[in-house]
């Protein structure tokens, strides 16, 4: 992974990349620590660790008290171009890191990291599939934890407990300073049409401190329940959405659900390398309009 990033650095004529975010440290080092990873375009990457102090020091692992000690191990004065995680950090942190390289111009390393991470190795693909397999196994147990008289929040808590019992780490990271989520979302009744301030396809009223998902709606006969929970059974996530019914639903609900499944399968077949995302969207919209279902497309016009 480091070598892939070094190739990208050389292609962009950037001499080094500084990584500080937890998720990218995990991706590149296999663990999370307080400190930074310095990746030169040529040569070995260097870890500078503030906490914990339990890592054994070596030629590439250094214990530090503050990031300014980077210059004790690297000639920071000769670097002319450095990439920082500009989309991930506070302005003050970025300024502090820029002072480490007084003669450098700075570039956004977030895009480089994203470009490297989007290419999955066979091992990474298998890790994702294993997470999804475990996720599916848990979803098959969901009907067993439903009890009459529950609210949507009661039901969601039981599902969250079920997922944790089967190995979910329970932590879910969202990219973006204004993005937040817990383990997922459960929507039922009119609450499913409530818009959210977050950049998710669906909303739900939630609570003021987390306006997303369940809101203590009583679950009743004839109600559809959408369960959209994230699975974290390793280093990769899976995101699985299923719709359940409490008893029988109106025939229109089954028709629209079948239409959604058809669109899903068609997009899988059409989404090839080089496909236009806009055209895939427009084709789905044409199919929905032809089926007289535009008012229901993507859940709600408010979202």
Regions found by a protein language model. Name each.
Residues 1-303:
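Active-site neighborhoods and metal-handling regions in enzymes and metal-associated proteins
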């Amino acid at each position: 992974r480091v070598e892939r990033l070094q190739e990208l650095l050389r292609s962009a004529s950037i001499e080094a990349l500084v990584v500080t975010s937890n998720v990218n440290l995990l991706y590149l080092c296999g663990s999370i620590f307080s400190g930074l990873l310095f990746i030169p375009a040529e040569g070995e990457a260097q870890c500078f660790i503030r906490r914990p102090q339990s890592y054994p020091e070596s030629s590439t692992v250094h214990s530090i008290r503050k990031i300014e000690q980077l210059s004790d191990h690297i000639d920071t004065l000769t670097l002319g171009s450095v990439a920082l995680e500009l989309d991930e950090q506070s302005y003050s942190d970025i300024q502090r890191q820029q002072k480490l390289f007084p003669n450098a111009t700075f570039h956004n390393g977030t895009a480089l990291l994203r470009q490297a991470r989007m290419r999955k190795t066979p091992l990474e693909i298998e890790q994702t599939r294993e997470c999804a397999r475990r996720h599916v196994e848990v979803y098959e147990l969901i009907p067993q934890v439903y009890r009459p008289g529950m609210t949507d929040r009661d039901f969601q808590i039981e599902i969250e407990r079920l997922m944790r019992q089967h190995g979910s780490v329970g932590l879910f990271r969202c990219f973006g300073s204004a993005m937040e989520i817990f383990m997922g979302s459960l929507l039922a009744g009119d609450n499913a049409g409530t818009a959210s301030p977050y950049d998710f396809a669906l909303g739900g009223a939630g609570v003021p401190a987390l306006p997303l998902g369940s809101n203590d709606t009583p679950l009743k006969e004839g109600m559809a329940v959408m369960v959209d929970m994230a699975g974290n059974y390793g280093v990769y996530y899976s995101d699985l959405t299923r719709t359940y019914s409490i008893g029988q639903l109106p025939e229109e609900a089954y028709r629209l659900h079948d239409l959604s499944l058809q669109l899903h399968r068609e997009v899988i077949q059409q989404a090839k390398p080089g496909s236009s995302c806009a055209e895939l969207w427009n084709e789905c919209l044409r199919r929905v309009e032809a089926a007289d279902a535009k008012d229901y497309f993507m859940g709600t016009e408010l979202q």
